[in-house]
Amino acid sequence: MGNHALIKQINKLLILKTILDHRTISRAKISKLVDLNKATVSNLTDELIKEGFVIEKGYGHSKGGRRPVLLEVNKNVGLIIGIDLGVNYIHLVLTNFIGEIIWERNMAIKLGEKQEKILESLFIILEEAIKAAPPTQKGILGIGIGVPGIVEKNSGTVLLAPNLKWQDVPLKRMVESRFGLPVYIDNEANAGALGEKWFGGWGDVSHLLYVSVGIGIGAGIVIGEEVYRGAKGFAGEVGHMTIDFNDDVCSCGNVGCLENFASERALLSLIKTLVESGVEDEYINRDTVEEMDAGYIIQSALQRSRVAMNAITDIANKLGIGIANLVNIFNPDIVVIGNKASFMGDLFLEELRRIVYKRAFITQYHHVRVEVSKLKDRACVLGCVAMVISDMLAFPDYV
């Protein structure tokens, strides 16, 4: 694609996103907001209308003269599937074209499950979603998948996902050949960051840092409207940032990684260590420790379990150190905490903020908001929906 065509597609996506953000909006207001001349906006919106992605929806108010025609995104033009392929779960949503969820499914998978079994489960849940899809003008437009690892985005190959024990898995090709639909693959934290930008209520934030805390830890960085990817597209692997020289070996083969101290896995390990040392209460004790998961610990903390509260505070403390480093490096306007950590409650958030504001040098000069995701565990799946829309519109063959 030449530069002119690329710029046209970027502007087209920018206009579509602006309409999506405002629900209904006039061409004149779009022109002011995106800093494009009225003729360009008119031509591109007319193309979007012809293609079925935008519709005219009544008239706006006018202080004098002709009332402006209002535009809105055609939510029923087609459907999108977003998938968060986690280490111990698969989370899928089927949405309309504005990200409203029509059908949703969570499927647990066993930790350490073989690649073939995980793919089999993925195909089963995809088949269920496709069967559940209602008829629309363009049908299912694409499938977006977020994966916890390093992804070569253009080819859709999972180069390395240490917590899944995957290496060089051509996931895009495998899913496309099975279902005959366009497939878009990215790192789950990048997808989560995009989900927050598009659907999380942070559309006006220029510099957003999303930190996904589950079995592993990853980060997605949004600058302007774009996810920052680095030289080869591998930026954001903050879970493998070294914060200790002498710790146990991480799943990646390194030692002292942040994941070893501040992830869901670290929380479970810490609870077991506490119980083995005799620290127990009615919720967390020798009778419950072997069967519990992170969800149980979080619920116990919300029920005022001292053991669970102490463990979550410790995790927040260590995660805060990692995030303080990221704040110093990237200087974001906001840090959004997602995935499992978004359910950890006020105690977790208060301690996390305390550490970030104490240790991040730049917070003396620039206030950085630290928030939990309003999307909770849907940031990645909705980000995958946004990824399908944005990647699809980046190429002229999508219609």
UniProtKB/Swiss-Prot annotation:
Pfam families: MarR, ROK
Keyword Glycoprotein: no
Keywords: Carbohydrate metabolism, DNA-binding, Repressor, Transcription, Transcription regulation, Xylose metabolism
Disulphide connectivity of cysteines: none
Claim: Acetylation is one of the keywords in the record: no
DNA-binding region of this protein: 27-46
InterPro entries: ATPase_NBD, HTH_MarR-typ, ROK, ROK_cs, WH-like_DNA-bd_sf, WH_DNA-bd_sf
GO molecular function: DNA binding; DNA-binding transcription factor activity
GO biological process: D-xylose metabolic process
CDD domains noted in UniProt: ASKHA_ATPase_ROK_BsXylR-like
Family: Belongs to the ROK (NagC/XylR) family.
Its job: Transcriptional repressor of xylose-utilizing enzymes.
Protein name: Putative xylose repressor
Organism this protein belongs to: Caldicellulosiruptor sp. (strain Rt8B.4)
